[in-house]
Amino acid sequence: MNIYAIGDLHLSGNPPTKPMNIFGPHWDNHWQRIKEHWLSTVTDEDIIFLVGDMSWALRLDEALYDLKEIASLPGQKFMIRGNHDYWWSSANKMKNAMGDAITFLQGHGTARIINLTTQVNALTGESQSTEHQCILAFGGTRGYICPDDASFEPDTDQSIYDREILRTEAALQEMEHAIQALQKGHGETENTEETLPVTRILLLHYPPFNENNAPSGFTDLMERYHVDICIFGHLHDQISFKRIPSTFGTTKLELVSADYAEFKIQKIL
């Protein structure tokens, strides 16, 4: 099993009602290019994190074509909301619409025991695949622009920011509860006191800090809950692409906006 991620697909039906090449020729046929790479890279057992801005639709029924397109591709899909996902509805309505084809996460977290595939170099110099068992914990929410960002207006944005901090912590707490339950079950099943290694992944749509990469409530939570990897999108300009560091504290950062990733699924683990 491998772990992949991508964000900001910005789909709008077929033919697209909002072609993305209005933002530049690099967006030409972007969905076809993403699909081709996805199909050549991902297997059904792999996990795919989709970090928001999936469809320009305004209502859930209008987004179904795009969601079914995504669902038809390989992999186990987990999706959070982006700032342009106006179609996002209640958990029950989305579950009824898509069944188990896509799991929608918003302020929630989970964990599972997986066999993670890693590549090692053999003594012969050839690359070989090995698998090791571990706990993968993940969850998240949309996030929001952070204080002291140029676009942050305290009168209107502070309450939304505070709410998203609460949702993020709720997801991280659910992840921890799931980890504890899996560790306990593993110990009882295997009759061992040894614990499985854990990788914690936080999913956000917005970056976890402002345009100056300053600490925020999100980065505080990343440190407090020992988040190993934070995956996010939202950004679409070269200045932002260049300013994102590879790590924040001990957390690895993964920007996966579709255009930043050259319209390819990004391998996380």
What does each of the following model-derived ranges do?
Residues N2-D8:
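Short, hydrophobic/glycine-enriched beta-strand segments
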Residues L9-S12, H37, T41, W88-A214, ...:
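Conserved catalytic scaffold of divalent metal-dependent phosphoesterases
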Residues G7, R81, H108, R142, ...:
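Residues at the C-termini of beta-strands that transition into short coil/loop
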Residues D8, G52-D53, G82-N83, H205, ...:
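Active-site glycine-centered loops adjacent to acidic/histidine catalytic or metal-binding residues
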Residues I3, I47, L136-A137, T199-I201, ...:
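Structural motif
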Residues N2, P16-Q119, A214-H226, T251, ...:
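Core catalytic region of metal-dependent phosphoesterases/phosphodiesterases
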Residues F78, D100, H132-Q133, P208-L269:
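Conserved beta-sheet core of the metallophosphoesterase superfamily
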Residues S12-T17, E262-F263:
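Short N-terminal binding/cap micro-motifs at the start of the first secondary-structure element
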